[in-house]
């Protein structure tokens, strides 16, 4: 059980949350655009002030590790590393696609016990970063950079219901065009949803080396590779 500060900057949304023993006690979000360089420091200062005013020891910092916006992720990870160095806290990495799945699993969808869930992040044009999970958040297929067409997820769709969500999902639905394909709207990676994932990793002792931790990227698109240079 721990006090964990979580940082999420993988998309245009910037968010910071503080959880204590897995329960969120502070949440800050900015949905106005890619303002991480401006907003993240303000949110972190507010979170640290909140923790310190209550004499709660900060034991770990969790950060979204990708895939996602390369610039946004770098800003978030740099902040997380700085906090870990300054506070002597542990560093926890949370994969963005796993984080995206949390509100879907905790919400009304999917209803079917054998349904599969596919979080997607936009990688431009008809390419997405995607991963396939079951309802217990067990990996069915690892992260891939998919160029989506009617056949991409057919093997899963032919078995039963599959729920697609994230900022890469809507553009793919017309192409997928299958009766078992369902779109879950308005799902974003948010720091407040890191709480159960970060707490689990803390209990299991799954920490990153602060000095050598790297972002998670799988087969980035040419545009992403150009941006990262």
What are these regions (language model features)?
Residues 51-56, 85-94, 112:
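Phosphate-handling active-site elements
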Residues 23, 35, 90-189:
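Surface "functional belts" at beta-alpha junctions
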Residues 217-226:
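Conserved small/polar residues in nucleotide/adenosyl-binding loops
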Residues 62-96:
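DPxDG-like acidic metal-binding loop motif
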Residues 31-42, 70, 74, 78, ...:
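Residues at secondary-structure transition points
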Residues 1-67:
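N-terminal beta-alpha supersecondary unit
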Residues 184-216:
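Glycine-rich phosphate-binding/hydrolytic loop that grips phosphoryl groups
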Residues 47-51, 86, 104, 194-201:
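Stable alpha-helical structural segments in soluble proteins, enriched in small hydrophobic residues
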């Amino acid at each position: 059980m721990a006090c964990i500060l979580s940082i999420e900057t993988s998309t245009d949304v910037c968010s910071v949350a503080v959880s204590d023993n897995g329960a969120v006690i502070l949440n800050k979000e900015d949905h106005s655009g890619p303002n991480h360089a401006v907003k993240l420091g303000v949110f972190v200062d507010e979170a640290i002030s909140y923790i310190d005013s209550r004499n709660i020891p900060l034991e770990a910092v969790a950060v979204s590790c990708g895939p996602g916006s390369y610039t946004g992720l770098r800003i978030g990870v740099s902040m997380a590393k700085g906090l870990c160095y300054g506070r002597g806290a542990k560093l926890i990495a949370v994969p963005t696609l796993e984080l995206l799945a949390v509100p879907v699993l905790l919400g009304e969808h999917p209803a079917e016990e054998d349904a599969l869930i596919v979080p997607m992040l936009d990688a431009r044009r008809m390419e997405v970063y995607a991963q396939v999970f079951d309802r217990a958040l067990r990996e069915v297929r690892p992260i891939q950079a998919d160029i989506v067409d009617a056949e991409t997820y057919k093997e899963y769709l032919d078995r039963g219901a599959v729920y697609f969500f994230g900022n890469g999902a809507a553009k793919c639905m017309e192409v997928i065009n299958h009766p078992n394909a369902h779109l879950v709207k308005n799902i974003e990676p948010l720091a407040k949803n890191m709480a159960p994932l970060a707490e689990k990793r803390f209990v299991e002792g799954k920490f990153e080396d602060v000095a050598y931790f790297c972002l998670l990227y799988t087969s980035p698109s040419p545009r992403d590779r150009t941006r990262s240079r």
